[in-house]
């Protein structure tokens, strides 16, 4: 995180009244909750992505990962955040992928129960094109719906899997907007590379510009 959370929010609040906070490093919640409470903004929260793995077959690690998400949900409730974005996890060992997927399904059930304890909506995000990633295609969306969880469409990730058109019919509640060449996860400015955003903009969903650099946000 390039800037302290307060400074980043002060700058961004001049552009929008809706901000998604990535809960990590110098923007971790609840550690820096006071900074977020200083602004009259609407929020969504992205739970930490490097502090756990809800698709981890080792039960202690899976449970610890859910505990981190629970802390994010508590902070989200304090802020009155509308959505908590959650990554579905990964598996680095091919021969363990099936067990990892089973662990993910257990976590989805746990998230269903956890969501009932809070007022924030839980949204699970589709991931990129690495073989280790779960939820690369829309066939996982019905599992989320059955559990009462929302779907966060990451447009850039969908493009990496040549699956954007397939995902558009899944009626996401939350959308991450960024561009790429379809090769790696660039998080480039909207319209600067390959993705046709005209179809995306027709979605009835909250859109979050998720570019890597502040200058790319301004270009978007």
How would you name each of these model-derived features?
Residues 1-71, 150:
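N-terminal pre-domain/capping segments
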């Amino acid at each position: 995180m390039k800037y302290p959370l307060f400074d980043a929010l002060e700058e961004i609040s001049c552009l929008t009244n809706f901000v998604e906070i990535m809960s990590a490093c110098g923007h971790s919640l609840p550690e820096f909750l006071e900074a977020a409470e200083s602004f009259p903004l609407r929020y969504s929260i992205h739970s930490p992505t490097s502090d756990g793995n809800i698709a981890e077959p080792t039960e202690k690690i899976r449970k610890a990962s859910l505990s981190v998400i629970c802390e994010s949900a508590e902070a989200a409730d304090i802020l009155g955040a509308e959505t908590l974005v959650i990554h579905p996890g990964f598996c680095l060992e091919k021969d363990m992928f099936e067990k990892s997927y089973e662990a993910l399904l257990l976590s989805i059930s746990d998230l269903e129960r956890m969501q009932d304890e809070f007022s924030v909506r839980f949204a699970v995000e589709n991931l990129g094109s690495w073989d280790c990633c779960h939820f690369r295609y829309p066939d996982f969306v019905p599992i989320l719906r059955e559990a009462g969880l929302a779907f966060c469409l990451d447009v850039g990730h969908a493009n990496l899997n040549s699956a954007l058109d397939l995902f558009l019919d899944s009626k996401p509640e939350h959308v991450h907007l960024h561009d790429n060449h379809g090769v790696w996860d660039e998080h480039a400015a909207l319209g600067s590379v390959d993705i046709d955003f005209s179809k995306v903009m027709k979605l009835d969903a909250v859109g979050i510009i998720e570019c890597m650099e502040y200058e790319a946000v301004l270009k978007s």
